[in-house]
Every structure is written in C-alpha cells, then in structure tokens.
A protein has these predicted regions:
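Helix-to-loop junction immediately C-terminal to a conserved catalytic motif
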Residues: 49
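ABC ATPase nucleotide-binding domains
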Residues: 222, 226, 232-265
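The feature captures the beta-strand-to-loop junction immediately N-terminal to the Walker
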Residues: 34-36
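Catalytic Walker B motif of ABC-type/P-loop ATPase nucleotide-binding domains
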Residues: 158-162
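Conserved ABC ATPase "signature" region
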Residues: 112-129, 154
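Conserved ABC ATPase signature
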Residues: 133-137, 141
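Conserved ABC transporter NBD signature motif
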Residues: 57-65
Length: 265
C-alpha cells in the first residue's frame, strides 16, 4: 500500500514546474524531498495534496486515483502543512487542533474528536497551552500546534513542506522526532521537504532529490553518495561518519559550468 506518482507534470498557468515525476512513497517510512530553491518540491507536495491540479499524469493512493476523490475524502486521507504562513487565525490552541477533526463532524465535534485532540496535545507536550491564542506562541510552539492539527485528521498520508523552517535546533529536533515516531507508530506515508542535508540523513528513510522540476535521484539514506549531493546542489564535499551518524561536510562550491549533470530518472 503506497502513494504512487506516475508521469506527473504540474505548474502554474502555462509554466511547468514539475516535469515527469515517477515515484512511489511507502507506508511506515519518512520520505524526504530535497533540492535547490525553485526545483519544484513545494509544487509536487501541493499537487499530491490536491491543492494544485496536475497538468499530466496520475497520483494514486492505495490504488485509487486522487482525481476521483472528493475534497472531504481527501481531508480524511491526506494532511498537508504548507510552508509557514504569517497569517494565522486568532484561535486558541485547542480550537486550532480541533479544526483537524472537521472532516469527521456531523453536528459539531463529538466525544471521539475531543479524545483525539486531547491525546495529541499530550503527545506533543502542549498541555497547558490549550487556551492560549496561537498568535501569542513562539515559532516552535506554533509549528507544533500546526503539526498537531494535521495529526488530528488521523490521516494516512502526511505532507509537510519545510516544517522546521526558521526554527532553532532544539525545536527542529523535537518536531522531527515527533514526525518520525508518529510515522512508525501509525504506519503513515510521510513526505516532508527539508533543506538541511544532515537532518535528512538523520531522520530520512528514503530520500528524493529534485532539480529543475525533475527527480534526479531516489534511494535509501544509507545509499546516498557525495556525488549525488554534488550533482544536485553544485557543492563539493564528503560524507563522513561521526557517532554512528552520517554527515555531509562541504569543502567547496562548484559553478554549473564545471559539472555535467546526468539525465533525470
């Protein structure tokens, strides 16, 4: 059971940002998408969340075409967290997380909805924040609340676009730990966009590298080579091991004219 993208082209107006993507994202794994700015990572996630319609190609979840599913069905299956926005409605933490249960409401929230929200508040260590307004929270606290809202949907797929952007190292680690543990515990299909290679190596099971709208490399984190990183990001360096953790150490910058890039997958 998986999320499968086949021959996908997507973009805005007449511009194609994602070009010919073929990929399978499996359950129970943290799948991390990496690539330079403007490589199509966010557009890919938006298309998989059905925020953006594909120009060509298909997206199938558990062998069902997303195009044939209603928005309510999508909301029960897929939770999508876009890049951080400065405009957050003035609601309490509890109300914000409860919004994740809205696809399941009949005549407002029931006992089951409240139980799920309270459980997630405990899990993400947000106890004591329930009655605070979200616009009064720190960046790390707000990201936890927005992640909690996604988890409240009890989705099968979690799509997170740069969920640790602008956060300090402690909050980055806390949020990534929650994502990884929840993915394994609930057997989620998790996709997240990251820019930090070393955090991707630490938390990713499978990595997907994009450049210029195309998928250039995919594989397990343990299979990644420095040549792939150099090809995608145009920086030279080495993969080293420290305390059982693989790290990429940059040695120099490579201009595009100095490298020859292979074709996309």
């Amino acid at each position: 059971l998986s999320l499968e993208v086949k021959g996908l082209y997507a973009g805005y107006n007449g511009s194609l940002v994602v070009q010919g993507i073929d990929a399978i994202f499996s359950k129970g794994r943290v799948n991390i998408i990496l690539g330079p700015n403007g490589s199509g990572k966010s557009t890919l996630l938006k298309t998989m969340a059905k925020v953006l319609q594909p120009k060509v190609g298909t997206i199938r979840l558990f062998n069902k075409d997303l195009q044939n599913l209603s928005l309510k069905e999508i909301a029960k299956l897929i939770a999508y967290l876009p890049q951080r926005s400065n405009s957050v409605p003035r609601m309490t933490v509890f109300e914000t997380i409860l919004l994740g249960r809205k696809p399941y409401f009949t005549f407002g929230p029931g006992n089951r909805d409240l139980e799920i929200v309270n459980s997630i508040i405990e899990e993400l260590k947000l106890k004591g924040f329930e009655n605070k307004f979200v616009d009064e929270l720190s960046g790390g606290e707000l990201q936890k609340v927005l992640l909690a809202r996604c988890l409240a949907q009890t989705p099968k797929v979690l799509l997170l676009d740069e969920p640790i952007n602008h956060l300090d190292p402690k909050n980055q680690i806390e949020i990534l730990e929650v994502i990884k543990k929840t993915t394994y515990r609930v057997n989620l299909i998790t996709l997240l966009v990251l820019h930090d290679l070393n955090l991707a190596l630490r938390y990713g099971d499978e990595l997907f590298f994009m450049k210029d709208g195309k998928l250039l490399w995919k594989g397990f984190a343990s299979e990644l080579t420095s040549e792939v990183i150099e090809m995608v990001f145009e920086v030279e360096g080495e993969l080293a091991e420290f305390s059982n953790q693989r790290l990429f150490i940059i040695s120099s910058y490579t201009t595009p004219s100095e490298k020859r890039f292979p074709k996309a997958l």
